């Protein structure tokens, strides 16, 4: 029986000293949306609280709850997912007895809510021991939450194989519906006027279905940001041609009116113009993830296919690709901004210029030549809008 905080700390020590025990890197409890036809198929996992490299005592109590009822836990595996039973919650709350009347213990508060709302097979405990290729839908969602809540940096977590594990489903008011269910019940649903309004069909939900952004972040259309994106405070996502994919986003306040593809990152103070595209790792970059530096301007309908440093401009309507050849101007001034780069020729391929600062990519309107020169303009966002 745990009656004091000293008892609790002793229990945690005993659990963590068990042979093979490993502290998880991340853990949380998810509410599950299961398939309408296949109840074993997980369509979505929603987390209200994510723990990342913290609250190890809470993790130890939950893992001990499962071991108490005979669940085998492989601490050498990369992840552990277990459906919650009411007895698990009761055991955990009994261990947390010295803290039950105190404020500020979010994991305890969450358990109290789940106990009140408990239904069989609706909640799962999910933890990651190592960052390896995900093995379950629940662990994919945990990783997407880690990205979207900015607990881990973009491109720092393994999502290989996620597409293969997630089901392609219909989404109605942010709830997933099996396409097989709709086909099997189409006549009944339509003839009884119960056919759901389908908002979209995809493997990923929308960012705003799971994440509450900062007060100074604006997203003008929910469809424009996929779950797993990361938006820094002060970012504005305009309607129209804007889009931010999973494992992509901004690291500071930005204006986004174009497309930030998967694995692309945009730095603070940059402006992605209307219809501009930043290529992702699957769209013409030879697998090279693109980062756009601080205070850059990607003109309307431009295409950026190489990493950019700070204070760069890509003029409207042009494509800066790895193989695009550019005539270099202002070499002496550019060398001062990029002292570790040797500007020793007149013609460069785009890929050779990756990551350099102060570049202005443009096209000569008479000759048609692609030119890269010193950026002599300051890119500054309207502070009133961010």
UniProtKB/Swiss-Prot annotation:
Q: Which UniProt keywords apply?
A: Acyltransferase, Amino-acid biosynthesis, Cytoplasm, Diaminopimelate biosynthesis, Lysine biosynthesis, Transferase
- Entry keyword annotation includes Transferase: yes
Q: Name one GO molecular function term.
A: 2,3,4,5-tetrahydropyridine-2,6-dicarboxylate N-succinyltransferase activity
Q: What EC number(s) does the entry state?
A: 2.3.1.117
Amino acids binding succinyl-CoA: 259, 274, 277, 300, 315-316, 323, 349, 362-365
In which domain of life is the source organism classified? Bacteria
Its top-level enzyme class, in one word, is: transferase
Question: Which pathway does the database say it acts in?
Answer: Amino-acid biosynthesis; L-lysine biosynthesis via DAP pathway; LL-2,6-diaminopimelate from (S)-tetrahydrodipicolinate (succinylase route): step 1/3
Query: Which Pfam families has this protein been placed in?
Result: Hexapep_2, THDPS_M, THDPS_N
Coiled-coil stretches, from where to where?
Answer: none
As for subcellular location, the record says: Cytoplasm
Instruction: Name the InterPro entries on file.
Output: Hexapep, THDPS_M, THDPS_M_sf, Trimer_LpxA-like_sf, Type2_DapD
Which GO terms of type biological process are on file? diaminopimelate biosynthetic process; lysine biosynthetic process via diaminopimelate
| Reaction(s) the record says it catalyses | (S)-2,3,4,5-tetrahydrodipicolinate + succinyl-CoA + H2O = (S)-2-succinylamino-6-oxoheptanedioate + CoA
User: In the UniProt record, which is one GO cellular component term?
Assistant: cytoplasm
Give the positions the UniProt entry annotates as the active site.
Answer: 257
This chain's function reads: Catalyzes the conversion of the cyclic tetrahydrodipicolinate (THDP) into the acyclic N-succinyl-L-2-amino-6-oxopimelate using succinyl-CoA.
Q: How does it assemble?
A: Homotrimer.
State the similarity comment. Belongs to the type 2 tetrahydrodipicolinate N-succinyltransferase family.
Please give the name of this protein: 2,3,4,5-tetrahydropyridine-2,6-dicarboxylate N-succinyltransferase
Source species, please?
Campylobacter jejuni subsp. jejuni serotype O:2 (strain ATCC 700819 / NCTC 11168)
* The encoding gene: dapD
């Amino acid at each position: 029986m745990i009656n004091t905080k000293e008892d609790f700390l002793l229990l945690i020590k005993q659990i963590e000293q068990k042979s093979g025990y490993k502290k998880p890197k991340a853990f949380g409890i998810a509410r599950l949306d299961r398939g309408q036809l296949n109840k074993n198929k997980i369509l979505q996992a929603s987390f209200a609280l994510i723990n990342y490299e913290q609250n190890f005592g809470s993790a130890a109590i939950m893992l001990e709850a499962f071991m108490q009822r005979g669940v085998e836990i492989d601490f050498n595996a990369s992840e552990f997912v277990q459906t919650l039973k009411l007895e698990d919650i009761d055991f955990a709350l009994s261990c947390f007895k010295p803290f039950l009347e105190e404020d500020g213990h979010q994991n305890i508060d969450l358990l109290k809510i789940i106990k009140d709302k408990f239904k069989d097979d609706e909640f799962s405990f999910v933890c990651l021991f190592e960052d390896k290729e995900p093995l379950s839908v629940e662990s994919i969602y945990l990783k997407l939450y880690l990205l979207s809540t900015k607990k881990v940096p973009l491109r720092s977590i393994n999502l290989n194989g996620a597409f293969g594990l997630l089901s392609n489903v219909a989404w109605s008011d942010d709830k997933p519906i099996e396409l097989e269910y709709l086909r099997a019940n189409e006549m009944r649903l339509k003839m009884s006027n119960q056919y759901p309004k389908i908002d979209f069909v995809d493997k990923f939900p929308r960012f705003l279905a799971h994440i509450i952004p900062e007060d100074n972040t604006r997203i003008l259309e929910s469809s424009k940001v996929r779950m797993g994106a990361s938006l820094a405070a002060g970012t504005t996502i305009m309607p129209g041609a804007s889009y931010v994919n999973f494992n992509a986003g901004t690291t500071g306040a930005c204006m986004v009116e174009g497309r930030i593809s998967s694995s692309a990152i945009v730095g603070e103070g940059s402006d992605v113009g209307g219809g501009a595209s930043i290529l992702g790792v699957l769209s013409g970059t030879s697998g090279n993830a693109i980062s756009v530096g601080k205070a850059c301007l990607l003109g309307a309908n431009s295409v950026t296919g190489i990493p950019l440093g700070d204070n760069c401009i890509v003029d409207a309507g042009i494509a800066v690709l790895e193989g695009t050849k550019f005539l270099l101007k202002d070499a002496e001034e550019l060398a001062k901004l990029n002292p570790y780069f040797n500007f020793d020729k007149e013609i460069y391929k785009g890929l050779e210029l990756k990551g350099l600062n102060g570049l202005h990519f443009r096209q000569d309107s008479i000759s048609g030549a692609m030119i890269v020169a010193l950026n002599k303009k300051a890119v500054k966002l309207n502070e009133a809008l961010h």
